[in-house]
Curated annotation (Swiss-Prot):
GO terms for molecular function: bacteriochlorophyll binding; electron transporter, transferring electrons within the cyclic electron transport pathway of photosynthesis activity; metal ion binding. A ubiquinone binds at W255. It is a multi-pass membrane protein. SUPFAM superfamilies: Bacterial photosystem II reaction centre, L and M subunits. It comes from Roseobacter denitrificans (strain ATCC 33942 / OCh 114). Reaction center is composed of four bacteriochlorophylls, two bacteriopheophytins, two ubiquinones, one iron, and two highly hydrophobic polypeptide chains (designated L and M). GO terms for cellular component: plasma membrane light-harvesting complex; plasma membrane-derived chromatophore membrane. Fe cation binds at H222, E237, H269. (7R,8Z)-bacteriochlorophyll b binds at H185, H205. Belongs to the reaction center PufL/M/PsbA/D family. This is Reaction center protein M chain. Its main location: membrane.
C-alpha cells in the first residue's frame, strides 16, 4: 500500500540523530551555531520536527538587535498614547500607531514627539532589514548555493525601500512614509489610493495584482500536483528533475490533457519564483511613480484611453427622475 497524504499535516514523523548541517574547515561555522537541537512534535506536523541549532553570525546579531530596538520604540510610543495603561494598550492595539512627521518638517529631523521617534525607529528597521538581506547572501555563499533566496527577499526589500525611503525623499517629506500600526497602515493605503485618483488605474498596480494572483494560482497548482503524485515518488522533486519518472509523466499528462501545456519539474519553480518576485517589483515601481510622475491615475488612464471619459451628468438627474434611473417609472 502506498503512503498517501490525507490532510495538511504530516502523519508520519521520522526521527534520528539531529542533523547538524555542513561544516567547512575554513569557515568554522560550527563555532557560531548555538542551541542544542531537539525535536518538536508540533513543528513536525508542519515540516521538519528538528529545532536548532541556530547559526548566529554577526549579521544575525545586528539584525535582531536593531529589529528589537524598532519594536521597543514603536511599542513604547503606542503605550504612551494611552497613558501607559496596559489594559488600554491591549484594547486599542489595532488602532494605535507611530505616525511619520508632519509635512512642514520636510526631510529634516523633527522633535521626538512630532515624528522624531518615527525617524529613529525607521533607521533601526532599515538597518535590521538590510542586515538580514546581507545575511541571506552570506549564508548562500557559505553553502555554495545559488542566490535565488537573496534576490527574492531583495524584491520585497525594494518595495519596503520605495514606501519608506525612496518615495519620501523624491517627494521631499518624511510625511509621505507609511505609519507603523495595524489599522493605521491600512487607512494610509486607502487614503493614498484616493489621493492619487485610485491606484486601480495604475498599470503597475495592475501588473502587481496579476503576479500576486498568478503566484497563488501557480502555488496551488504545483502543490496540488505534487501531493497528487506523492504515491509515485513525486515528492522527491530533485530526482524527478534529472531522472523523470512515472510521477512526472502522470502529472505532465494531466496538465496537457487539462490545458494543452505542462511545465517541467524544474520549470514550474522558475515560473513560481518569477511571479512571486515580480509582485513587489512592479508594485514598487507603481508606488514610486505615484505623486512623483503621476498626480491622478484616473485622469492619466483617461488620457491614455485606459478609462472611460464621462461627459456631463451620469446620475439620476440625467434620466429625468430617480424612478426612471432605477427603471421603475410608470
Amino acid at each position: 500500500m502506498y503512503p498517501e497524504y490525507q490532510n495538511i499535516f504530516t502523519q508520519v514523523q521520522v526521527r534520528g540523530t539531529p542533523e547538524m548541517g555542513m561544516d567547512d574547515a575554513g569557515n568554522n561555522m560550527m563555532e557560531e551555531r548555538v542551541g542544542k537541537p531537539f525535536f518538536s512534535t508540533l513543528a513536525g506536523l508542519f515540516g521538519n520536527g528538528q529545532i536548532g541549532p541556530y547559526y548566529f553570525g554577526w549579521t544575525s546579531i545586528v539584525a535582531f538587535g536593531t529589529g528589537i530596538a524598532w519594536f521597543v520604540i514603536v511599542g513604547f510610543n503606542m503605550l504612551a498614547q494611552v497613558g501607559w495603561s496596559i489594559p488600554q494598550f491591549i484594547r486599542q492595539l489595532f488602532w494605535l500607531a507611530l505616525e511619520p512627521p508632519s509635512p512642514e518638517y520636510g526631510l529634516s529631523m523633527p522633535p521626538l514627539n512630532d515624528g522624531g521617534w518615527y525617524i529613529i525607529a525607521s533607521f533601526f528597521l532599515l538597518v535590521s532589514v538590510m542586515t538580514w538581506l546581507l545575511r541571506a547572501y552570506l549564508l548562500a555563499e557559505q553553502h555554495k548555493m545559488g542566490k535565488h533566496i537573496f534576490w527574492g527577499f531583495a524584491a520585497a526589500v525594494w518595495l519596503f525601500l520605495v514606501l519608506g525611503l525612496f518615495r519620501p525623499i523624491l517627494m521631499g517629506s518624511w510625511s509621505e512614509a507609511v505609519p507603523y500600526g495595524i489599522f493605521p497602515h491600512l487607512d494610509w493605503t486607502t487614503a493614498f489610493s484616493i489621493r492619487y485618483g485610485n491606484l486601480y488605474y495604475n498599470p503597475f498596480h495592475c501588473l502587481s495584482i496579476v503576479f500576486l494572483y498568478g503566484s497563488v494560482l501557480l502555488f496551488c497548482m504545483h502543490g496540488g500536483t505534487i501531493l497528487a503524485v506523492t504515491r509515485y515518488g513525486g515528492d522527491r522533486e530533485l530526482e524527478q528533475i534529472y531522472d523523470r519518472g512515472t510521477a512526472t509523466e502522470r502529472a505532465a499528462l494531466f496538465w496537457r490533457w487539462t490545458m494543452g501545456f505542462n511545465a517541467t519539474m524544474e520549470g514550474i519553480h522558475r515560473w513560481a519564483w518569477w511571479f512571486a518576485v515580480l509582485t513587489p517589483i512592479t508594485g514598487g515601481i507603481g508606488i514610486l511613480l505615484t505623486g512623483t510622475v503621476v498626480d491622478n491615475w484616473f485622469i492619466w488612464a483617461q488620457e491614455h484611453h485606459f478609462a472611460p471619459m464621462y461627459d456631463g451628468s451620469y446620475g439620476y438627474e440625467d434620466y429625468g427622475s430617480y424612478e426612471a434611473f432605477i427603471g421603475k417609472e410608470n
